[in-house]
Amino acid sequence: MLSDPIADMLTRIRNATRAYKESVDIPASKFKEELAKLLVREGYVAGVERLRPEGQKFDVLRITLKYGQKREQVIKHIERVSRPGRRAYVSAENLPRVQRGLGLAVVSTSKGLLPDREARKQGVGGEVVCILW
């Protein structure tokens, strides 16, 4: 059993990107699906779909990865910030600016998962789930 399924998801994406895979399958949950859809909206992955493979009991998220024109990785760095053993909560004023605004911090707020820019704009803080650039 995994103690941190979000860290597992981010690790699978990181490993698949470094191996130049077309897509990666991840055990599905609502939170993971919301996180994947946010990555699609922000342009870090090409697509996400929820599937139930034949003969399986549980759904799977298939995340289609995205690469540049010369196969350069769109996601150069992805890391978990708030972990089960050390939660990271921040106010709207203290939200991190990743790579001076060129990266993305994903924040779990009372209004759902938001990129750091939107959370700052709406004036809400929350738990910093991960950062990527």
UniProtKB/Swiss-Prot annotation:
Gene3D superfamilies cross-referenced by the UniProt entry: 3.30.1370.30, 3.30.1490.10
GO biological process: translation
Tree of life domain: Bacteria
Pfam families for the chain: Ribosomal_S8 (PF00410)
GO molecular function, one term: rRNA binding
Coiled coil (UniProt feature): none
NCBIfam families: PRK00136.1 (NF001109)
Role noted for this protein: One of the primary rRNA binding proteins, it binds directly to 16S rRNA central domain where it helps coordinate assembly of the platform of the 30S subunit.
Protein name per its UniProtKB record: Small ribosomal subunit protein uS8
